[in-house]
Amino acid sequence: TNQWYAIAKIAGIKLCQAYRRQHGNDFISAMPTNLYGPGDNYDLASSHVIPALIRKAHEAKASGASQMIIWGSGSPRREFLHADDCADALVHILKTYSEDQHINVGSGADLTILELAQLIADVVGFHGQIVHDLTKPDGTPRKLMSGDRLAALGWRPGISLREGLAGAYRDFLTGDARGNVA
């Protein structure tokens, strides 16, 4: 998301590599893509894109609104992975990978924020218009990781984006009991 976050991730990778080389431990750095799933944060002030869009679509549907507003142009592309798939991938990596280089954990597919908003609106059942707030930032044009190392190990995600979003929406609907919905 920002320069300092990226620097911290790189520092963590380098620390694992150095510790592995110095002490002979089988440390592996796994770099996950954007994750979503059960127990997510649906507070619009602090949530990431998927839970924010789920909440916006739900509130638009529940209030009978004719439109749902999304940030920016909708053109940036993002990759997403369900948290359960990430956990599965990490177990697979622990069983099949022992290299010095970090390994990316992702779906290998991306879509635009507008396509994501349309998919979420469909899953939620909101049939109104999606409107762009061009006063809000787009962010980086594209974030898609290379999943070649993980694919070579024979791992593929098991949860489609639509299926995962439907599960996330079910989680949102029951989340207020856990305090996840502000």
Q: What label would you give each PLM region?
A:
Residues N2-W4, A18, L44:
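Active-site loop-to-helix junction immediately N-terminal to the catalytic Tyr of the SDR YXXXK motif
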Residues W4, A8-A11:
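Active-site helix of classical SDR
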Residues E59-A182:
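C-terminal substrate-binding subdomain of Rossmann-fold SDR/epimerase-dehydratase oxidoreductases
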Residues I13-P38, P51-L53, A62, Q67-I69:
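Conserved beta-loop-beta element that borders a ligand/cofactor-binding pocket
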Residues C16, K56, A117:
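Aromatic/hydrophobic pocket-lining residues that form π-stacking "cages" and hydrophobic walls in ligand
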Residues P38-N41, R149:
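Short beta-loop-alpha junction of Rossmann-like oxidoreductase domains
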Residues N41, A45, S73:
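Active-site "substrate specificity/gating" loop of NAD(P)-dependent dehydrogenases
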